[in-house]
Amino acid sequence: MARKKSRSSSTRKGSSLKVPEIKEKEKINAINTYEDVANSEDEFYNAQDKILFDADNGEQADELELSDEELVALESSSDEEDGNAEENLSENEELSGKKKDAVNEEELYDNKGWGRSAKSYYGGDDYDNEDYSEEDDEFDARMEEQEALRLQRKRLEKVSETDAIDDISQWADNSDLKSIKQDSSAAAIEELVQQISPDLPRTELLKILEAKHPEFQLFLDELNQLKPQLNEIKEKLKTYPSSQLLQAQCTALSTYISFLTFYFALLKDGEEDLKNHPIMVDLVRCKQTWESYCGLDEVLTPTSLEEDGKTIELHEKIASASDIGASEDEEDVDMHESISDNENEGIKDIPVAEDDDITLKFRAAKSKINTNIKNLDDYGEGNRLDDVDAEDKIARKRSLKFYANQIDQKAAKRSRAVLELSGDLDMPYKERRFERQQRLMREAAARGRNQDAGADLDDEDPESMGIPANVDREVEDQDDLDYYESLDKKSKMAKKLRKENHDLERDLIRASRHPELIELGEGDKRGITLDIAKNRGLTPRRPKENRNPRLKKRMRYEKAKKKLASKKAIYKGAPQGGYAGEQTGIKAGLVKSIKLQ
């Protein structure tokens, strides 16, 4: 067998290689983790990723606050920049130190100022607390009073006399500035007045007048604009003299124009201070009155004047035929009733302005004036009312008694109409066969009584006797026509009743909107408003259940039970008696149908 070669030769050759020496300064630690080879940037992000479970609240707050610590170190370009950065850093540290001191002082003051407990500022309206009692309320009130007194003393200690002196000096400076401005403006106006001479052009004179009296041009334009309107209203008033709205507009506008003219007269006489003159107050009041009437429009028709005259004549003739001992109010009510009840003498009243809130619209019916009224003429009786009588009539219409009589009258008419048009009387039904036979028999009997006594009445055909076969048909058509005419008459009466109700509501609304037009008699008082009658003030509504916490919880529990019963089946106890079958939910005493009137 062959012997194995020894490796002594190779070891001897390898032992001849030199091993480099390792210096102490170049030694490094063993690399076991990622942190062993991390640089400064990696260390910063590792510190950010750590979660400190045992850290205090103060340390967490410091971490959340803004800091001046640099994230990544940047190399500076020169030594000068390093010096400037150090100076800026020192200044920032000083400023931040001052700010922290100021914040600490403010926090101390705020902590003392906001009280010792949060109960004083939260939960003041929570009355549902079961542990709440009157003793706690008194204790809270005492503590609140003590805290308020302490805060007041603390603030008064900081106030000094110099604060008040500074305010007084500042007020004095402001008043001096205002007086100086007023004196300067007055002096400037006086200088402009002194510069007036007859040689100045018209434009310069207008500038001086505008500086001294700025309201002059406005009043002049308004006067030139209102004069044509006054003439138009006067022309309308001549055409419609019974229109109360036109009379009020004419009075308001003429008063306003007269005050404007008086203003120009004072200015012409040399009155200097017109801004403080009492006429300015009167001008403002007249302008407001005119603007309140200016927006109102009245619907006037060309025939309203003629109808007004005819209505007055009819009122006079009916009033002359009434009893001597009747009072004026009763006469007025009787006149209205006689006119409204007479269908052939239906006369339209004077049209007035329609209210926007009332949406009912009626079609204007044609006026049917009886021609016999025109021919009526009593000897010695006037054809038109005198001015005094007309004023008395208008005054009666403005009184509350007139409206009360109208309300009673229209309520009586409404009740009569309800009785007449109740049920199915206004519904057209087909005539029954039996009723038609009875009606034809009555008509035949009436015709037989009107015929001669010697007429031949036998069983022969009427056509063979020369009597036309459509006689009954014509009579039937005439009856149908009369029936439908009666229905038309009833519908017109119902429409007339609706119009009267509409007029009544309109008059009441107009009287409530313009209470100044209602003249109160002796002993009458104006009614109070709804706010005064209720006397609620500004107190919010609070339910009575809040006063009793036990009752409030009980009601809340009952409400929750009802809500739960609507969502799922609730056991309500064992059924009483024997088995009566499944319940249908139909109740014998419950009626949900609508009863026809």
From Swiss-Prot:
**Matching PANTHER family, A to Z?**
SOMETHING ABOUT SILENCING PROTEIN 10, SOMETHING ABOUT SILENCING PROTEIN 10-RELATED
Extract one GO molecular function annotation from the record. Answer: snoRNA binding
Question: Could you confirm whether the keyword Nucleus appears in this record?
Answer: yes
Per the record, residues carrying Phosphoserine are: S40, S133, S327, S340
Major place of residence:
nucleus
Record GO biological process: maturation of SSU-rRNA from tricistronic rRNA transcript (SSU-rRNA, 5.8S rRNA, LSU-rRNA)
Q: Spell out the protein name for this chain.
A: Uncharacterized protein C3B8.09
Q: Which family does it belong to?
A: Belongs to the SAS10 family.
Protein localization? Nucleus, Nucleolus
Task: Report biased composition (Acidic residues) as residue ranges.
Answer: 71-94, 125-139
Keywords assigned by UniProt? Nucleus, Phosphoprotein
Its GO CC terms are: nucleolus; nucleus; small-subunit processome
Annotated segments matching region Disordered: 1-23, 71-143, 444-464
The organism encoding this protein is Schizosaccharomyces pombe (strain 972 / ATCC 24843)
